[in-house]
Amino acid sequence: MNLHLFFKALVTVALLASSSACVGYDASKLNAGSGGYDKYPEFSWDHIPRYMHVWKRAAFTEEELDYLAQFPLITFEKATGVQVGSVQQGTLKAARGVKTRNPDAKILYYKNIVIDWGGSAASKELKTIEGAYLQSKDGSYPTVSRTTQFFDIGLPKVRAWWMKDARRMLDDPSIDGILIDANIKVLVDGFFLRQKKVGDEEYQRLKDGYGQLLTQIDAEFRADNIVLANIIRARLEHGGLNYLGYFDGSYLEAFEHNVGGVSRPDYIAKGIETVQAAARQGKIVAFTLGIKEALNQGNGGDFDSNEALHARVNYTAALFLIVAEKYSYFFPVDGMGVVTKGGKLANRLWMQTLPIFKKRLGAPKGPATKDGYIYTREFEHCSVWLDVENEVGTLTWR
């Protein structure tokens, strides 16, 4: 066991748990005394704070860069700019384009913790490392998306390779940090042990390597860079809070996808409690919630006439506002990719601004209150009412 990881996790859980009771609530002072916030994105309660998470194989147009420059926090996902040459080249080109328009925007480079997604300039070097790719018990190489393999961070050389690529990107002034994905695949043992048929010893080595890699990332990168992870999930015993000591915050997805026999309302309620604990300690929250199904109904992206879209956007925004604190950002998402391989628009909200982001919000007057599955919260210009059992949210603007 990685003892440094174990003890840091215990301290993190204790600190985060202590934040659940906010006496003398003041949203402007929740981060006081924590330090290290100079590297964080700009934040304002004037309107609902926005996050952007996107990829596009081709280069972004000038108009698209103008649009992206509006966001305080942006992650350029895997496949960004692969038609430019590599993910690294494409990410840097996009980041520099945004920075010329908005130097204050914070831009994150996407790094997967175990998956060697195609298009990366670093993959060539990985292939030269003996045993770099994870094998199943029968000697085969497990994959995701049919052909994409997993690298073995249980090996010191693979961890060094991972750090080298991250360091090279973080050394560029246009990159402000990294977003680390697929942590859940390492932490939920059923994925590698049962789905991918990896042996017990190999899996334990992978988990030990994960702890060692987090320690390296924390020591070498976090002083000057934002380090986010896809780490908060209600399915985990502590919701992922026991790992947040290694990160500046969490990207959130699959928030409503209940597993393990837990009811959907209870799963969402645990997620809310977990995110609140993290946000109240000044962690960055990049909250994504899907609205694809609502867009498929009615009149698509016409917010005024599509009742399903209107209801879904209000519900997801209410979920966000119930958990939000300073450095929380919201992204209602249709898709991360801008266009399909065939060149068709894949994200129907691309280059659009939903009406809720144009309304004045104002600072929260206090934390959310909870009564069963009903949550309420008051902001200067908005009253939030949320029912997670019936999945209804109401925003009353004034």
Predicted regions and their residues:
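Glycan-processing catalytic domains of CAZymes
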Residues: 25-398
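Bacterial N-terminal signal peptides that target proteins for export
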Residues: 1-10
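Bacterial N-terminal signal peptides
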Residues: 9-18
